[in-house]
Amino acid sequence: AMFAPFQLAGIVAISGYVYFFEEWKKSLKPSAFQTPWLITHGLEDDLLPVVTTRNQVQKLKDVGLPITWKEFMKDHEIDLHVETSFIRKWVRSKMVRTRRPTYLPPDQTSSSNSKQRFKSF
């Protein structure tokens, strides 16, 4: 997302880390500064300590990336109740209604499962 030549709708990163290379700041594309980010992490994560990721997120914020940072009382996992609810609300808040066609997966009960369907908003 930081190096994509086009703007993404948003980024959700869960219990991860950022690999910083020597020239990473100079390689950022302008679109990276327009892409909203949500980064979540567990306070009890023993695999990737929260302090490390918290410091990495601060580096990203310091260069101006629009990041929402959220810590949860969890290990290196996805909290299926509190965290997914928070993510769902964040994604919905970033969605923009457009007139562009959006792919919808085929209805599993439909006989036309192999056909792609599109919906315009």
Segments the model singles out, each with a brief description of its role:
Residues 10-96:
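The feature captures the conserved acid-bearing segment of alpha/beta-hydrolase catalytic domains
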Residues 82-121:
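Catalytic active-site module of serine/aspartate enzymes centered on a nucleophile-bearing elbow/loop
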Residues 1-5:
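Short glycine-enriched nucleophile-adjacent loop
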